Amino acid sequence: MAAGLDRDKALDNALAQIDKAFGKGSVMRLGDDTRPPIQAIPTGSIALDVALGIGGLPKGRVIEIYGPESSGKTTVALHAVANAQAAGGIAAFIDAEHALDPEYAGKLGVDIDNLLVSQPDTGEQALEIADMLVRSGALDIIVIDSVAALVPRAEIEGEMGDSHVGLQARLMSQALRKMTAALANSGTTAIFINQLREKIGVMFGSPETTTGGKALKFYASVRLDVRRIETLKDGTEAVGNRTRVKVVKNKVAPPFRTAEFDIVYGGGISREGSLIDMGVEHGIIRKSGAWYTYDGDQLGQGKENARSFLRDNPDLANEIEKKIKEKLGILPSVESDAVAPVPIDL
């Protein structure tokens, strides 16, 4: 008994010294109710929010969004930016590809007047800017578009044909080592958009891989595989894509869930389309033939008419979204009073 008391006293002394040296909360018991649940930033698609398990992208974590060209990667990221800004948050966009379209971003709901944008010359500059913004503690979300465009300084200053094996992978590994703890402490969500490449000589399994080495795969709490599966047409004219997203890694909820939603050209993710799909799937919206009804009221004949009706009646759309989230037990998304930095475990 005496030995046990001595151990407890020694532990208390050690914890007191650690708190004095490194600040209160440097070491804590997991059972201590000192931290709130993980907050989430909505993605703009109720189906994807449900697949992620917590109602959106987790705050204070590293997110990787990858897929083929024109699959909707940047669109998903910009919707998250728009939702973070709508809740009163501050957002930044590191445009390493020099391809950000402000007009399109504005149509998705991004407040382009207050969006912090950087178009860096080198990968080192891009990641240093991102690290400094995160460490300011004022940021809610930052997007790096894309990992493949983070070209090391040595490669830019060298000549065409020079070999620079592993430079980008080492750069990403170093940056993520520095940024991960800062992201958790500041409650900033970092979204890395990535491209696909094919490994040569793969006989079995998928030859696809992402750029930038393996560090991002390890540090990411959530990895989203975005694929275009169908073209949406109005008559013969293509008006959008049907998109499937697979949550291939998830540290905050069960992984390997999939979500499907519509991306309309010039308008981004169709929130109303996702509400109709999820509402029908879970019995909140009734589909009879081509007609969609909710609580006995007709929404429209055909999905496009029902979508237009919900777009014109946002209160009804919000009510349907709330019922879907309540039925599925999804945590509430980030609200305007919840954008302050929240320490989150890694």
Swiss-Prot record:
Any GO MF annotation of the entry: damaged DNA binding
Functional description taken from the UniProt entry: Can catalyze the hydrolysis of ATP in the presence of single-stranded DNA, the ATP-dependent uptake of single-stranded DNA by duplex DNA, and the ATP-dependent hybridization of homologous single-stranded DNAs. It interacts with LexA causing its activation and leading to its autocatalytic cleavage.
Family affiliation: Belongs to the RecA family.
Protein name as it appears in the record: Protein RecA
One Pfam family linked to the record: RecA_C
Record keywords: ATP-binding, Cytoplasm, DNA damage, DNA recombination, DNA repair, DNA-binding, Nucleotide-binding, SOS response
Keyword DNA-binding carried by entry: yes
GO CC aspect terms: cytosol
Alphabetized Gene3D superfamilies for the sequence: P-loop containing nucleotide triphosphate hydrolases
Matching CDD domains: RecA
Binding site for ATP: G67, P68, E69, S70, S71, G72, K73, T74
Single GO BP term: SOS response
Domain of life: Bacteria
Organism: Frankia alni (strain DSM 45986 / CECT 9034 / ACN14a)
Keyword Cytoplasm: yes
Subcellular localization: Cytoplasm
